[in-house]
Amino acid sequence: MTEQVQLDENKLIAERRGKLDHIRQACKANGHPNDFRRDSLAGDLQAEFGEKTKEELEELNHVVAIAGRVMAKRGPFLLIQEVSGKIQAYAAKEVQKELKDKYQGLDIGDIIGVKGALHKSGKGDLYVNMEEYVLLTKALRPLPEKFHGLTDQEMRYRQRYVDLIVNDDSRHAFIVRSKVVAAIRNFMVDKGFMEVETPMMHVIPGGASARPFVTHHNALDVDMYLRIAPELYLKRLVVGGFERVFEINRNFRNEGLSPRHNPEFTMMEFYMAYADYNDLMDLTEEMLSTVATSVLGSDKMPYGEHTVDFGGKYARMSMLDAIKQYNPDHAEIQALTYEGVKDRDLMVSIAKSVHVDVESFWTCGQLLEEIFGETAEPKLMQPTFITEYPADISPLARRNDDNDFITDRFEFFIGGREVANGFSELNDAQDQDERFKAQVNAKESGDDEAMYYDADYITALEHGLPPTAGQGIGIDRLVMLLTNTHTIRDVILFPSMRPQA
């Protein structure tokens, strides 16, 4: 903000504070009344009366009470915005004079209540005749001059309340988000899943490969970790006999900010006994088609230059096949087999040839995943399940019966990004013990995202986890797709931001 703009804004704020002082003195009150009751919403009025003629409304003489924020002043008309939409209020000359005398006039951003008969203008717009009115809240700060929204992206995120006032697209995105969460919850309950809540603070972080946030519990005098995933607790519940469970909640990962990543994000994670990863893929197809149709009225929608189709069966291919498909001219990749993937020198050579910056502690499976992420993932625009993830990057997934180098795991991609991760669960306590130990070794070798050893979880497995499949779906990324937005900050109400200087 330039110095001149700041001076102009300070002047406007001072003027509005002066008006509020005038109101308090004139009304002998605090200037923030709370006795006006609204009985109608703009959207409902438009739906019920929008098709009626001007003459029909005059004959009907339907009196309504509306309330909202003044977004524009056009001659005798005020444009009032509330949660369902916008509607005009008409101030006759005598009312305009009263507003000036009582309130020193209304400003853009003020919140008012209006009561009067519903009419229609010559242009066909509904409006309420201001027969009774009250200033409910005086806006002391001016809204951005451009009515269509903020132009400063960072300010939109730091002052989301202003963004929501002036930006229709932003409001729409968060309305869609709320509906998506509700639709997923209803779908899961209808499928016989029980919603549960598991701890947000863990003594041992687990359930995903990520760097955790650390906090300290003063009463217990122990360090604790904000959860990176609820997985191990949810599977403990399956051991306990709750055969279908789900949770919609926050996860926290102490990692970087990007258009795809926010350190605090929302996941829907669920587990179902007596199922495998194929059942999960089938359920995901049904869920996403149902959610899209329920929220947006169609299972087909635009995303950038593409039309994404959530209906029907989704593509399924192994990670190795996907790499080959999107690198048709790379001879070493075309000749690659799982035996070749086990050759670390070969994998390092291939990774470097496709511009992957290789870390010294990466396993062969990690190298394969990085090659996939660099060359194939961005091209997966339509719904696609990528399967056959190596066991060394899937420490909680069940090994494949025919090839123990890979697991019965998939990740779900759409719009060029991962949206979900699921697998048949590892329920062999001895195998899980060995994989936890391998993760500890990886952490000691420099992999900050490797998992910790969780002895109690091993104890739970020793009591017996039935054959189980589980999956996590990123709510934020799913909402990005359904709202055709390309940065995660546009679908998180208050995203993480660097402190202002």
UniProtKB/Swiss-Prot annotation:
Superkingdom: Bacteria
Any one Gene Ontology molecular-function term assigned to this protein's record: ATP binding
One Pfam family from the record: tRNA_anti-codon
Broad class of the protein's primary localization: cytoplasm
GO cellular component terms given for this protein: cytosol
Coiled-coil ranges per UniProt: none
Keywords: Aminoacyl-tRNA synthetase, ATP-binding, Cytoplasm, Ligase, Magnesium, Metal-binding, Nucleotide-binding, Protein biosynthesis
Keyword Plastid among record annotations: no
Catalytic activities: tRNA(Lys) + L-lysine + ATP = L-lysyl-tRNA(Lys) + AMP + diphosphate
Cofactor needs: Mg(2+)
InterPro entries: Aa-tRNA-synt_II, aa-tRNA-synth_II, aa-tRNA-synth_II/BPL/LPL, Lys-tRNA-ligase_II, Lys-tRNA-ligase_II_N, Lys-tRNA-synth_II_C, NA-bd_OB-fold, NA-bd_OB_tRNA
Cofactor remark from the record: Binds 3 Mg(2+) ions per subunit.
EC number: 6.1.1.6
Binding annotation for Mg(2+) 1: E411, E418
Keyword Metal-binding: yes
Binding site for Mg(2+) 2: E418
Localization (cell): Cytoplasm
One Gene Ontology term from the biological process aspect of the record: lysyl-tRNA aminoacylation
Similarity comment text for this entry: Belongs to the class-II aminoacyl-tRNA synthetase family.
Description of how the protein assembles with itself and partners: Homodimer.
Protein name as it appears in the record: Lysine--tRNA ligase
Lineage start: Bacteria, Pseudomonadati, Pseudomonadota, Gammaproteobacteria, Vibrionales
